């Protein structure tokens, strides 16, 4: 049985139920998942300044998840904020939804496009796709121009706008599959599909929440069998291998206060 911590990296519980209800149908029967959110962070990361503040809290949340006995940690935002830092800090697998989705996109189609929430996110996602080495397979990054705080007010309207944009992007770019490049947009889309919208369910749309959690399940299994052999020689080298005292100071700074609350604590 895998225990997975899925972090909504927002200083609010507004999205927890939406994520939980749209993720659970995709889980293995033996998988246990806990949805958490941040307790000392901005309510959204639509802009880069709050995103930077949130990244420190995400690092603390990853440490908490490992200490709480989780087998994997998912950062529930397609910016993949603090992904590299968390992998440096903890020994359990850490999964970012965008990295998971673009890495698996070839299994869904020869080329992909990304549809995200608003235009502010477009260049950031382009940069991350280039960082992940998959720019040549990406036909486009586009947006539906919704802000995250508005989405929970009318998730079905978000889903409908996403469906229209996905069709348009497929038609104009030739992309065979589309990754929804926002975890909340994707949850809105999945909610509509789960409620019986067969047209939405019929499109080749990649859900980053599901991709991240399924990858977390797999990597938790790999770790349990001794096969999660992450390299610590350079990119993910841990601070303590260089200076134990410095690493301890950083850890103390990161754990001065609890970073997260779970759905059961709200």
Over which residues does each language-model region extend?
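Glycine-rich, highly charged phosphate/nucleotide-binding loops
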Residues: 47-64, 158-165
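Short, flexible loop segments at boundaries between secondary-structure elements
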Residues: 146, 201-225
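Periplasmic-binding protein-like
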Residues: 7, 67-77, 175-183
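Short acidic, glycine/proline-enriched helix-loop-strand junctions
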Residues: 83-95, 189-210
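Short, acidic/turn-prone active-site loops that include or flank metal/cofactor-
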Residues: 97-102, 118-120, 209-212
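Active-site rim beta-loop-alpha module in soluble metabolic enzymes
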Residues: 129-183, 190-193
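Glycine/small-residue-rich loop that forms an oxyanion/phosphate-binding "nest" at active or ligand-binding sites
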Residues: 59-104, 108
């Amino acid at each position: 049985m895998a225990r997975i911590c899925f972090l909504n990296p927002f200083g609010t519980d507004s999205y927890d139920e939406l994520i939980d209800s749209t993720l659970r149908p995709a889980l293995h029967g033996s998988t246990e998942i806990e949805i958490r959110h941040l307790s000392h962070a901005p309510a959204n990361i639509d802009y880069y300044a709050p995103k930077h503040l949130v990244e420190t809290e995400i690092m603390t949340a990853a440490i908490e998840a490992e200490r709480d006995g989780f087998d994997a940690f998912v950062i529930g935002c397609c910016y993949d904020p603090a992904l590299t830092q968390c992998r440096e800090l903890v020994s359990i697998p850490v999964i970012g939804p965008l990295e998971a989705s673009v890495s698996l996109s070839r299994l869904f189609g020869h080329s992909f496009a990304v549809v995200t929430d608003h235009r502010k996110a477009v260049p950031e996602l382009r940069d991350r796709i280039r960082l992940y080495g998959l720019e040549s397979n990406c036909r486009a990054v586009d947006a539906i121009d919704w802000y995250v705080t508005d989405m929970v007010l009318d998730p079905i309207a978000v889903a409908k706008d996403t469906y229209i944009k996905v069709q348009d992007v497929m038609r104009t770019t030739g992309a065979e599959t589309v990754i929804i490049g926002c975890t909340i947009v994707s949850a809105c889309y999945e909610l509509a599909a789960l409620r019986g919208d067969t047209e939405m369910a019929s499109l080749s749309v990649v859900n980053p929440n599901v991709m991240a959690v399924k990858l977390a399940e797999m990597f938790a299994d790999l770790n349990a069998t001794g096969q999660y052999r992450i390299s610590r020689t350079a990119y993910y080298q841990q601070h303590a291998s260089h200076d134990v005292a410095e690493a301890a100071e950083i850890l103390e700074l990161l754990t001065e206060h609890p970073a997260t609350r779970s759905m059961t604590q709200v």
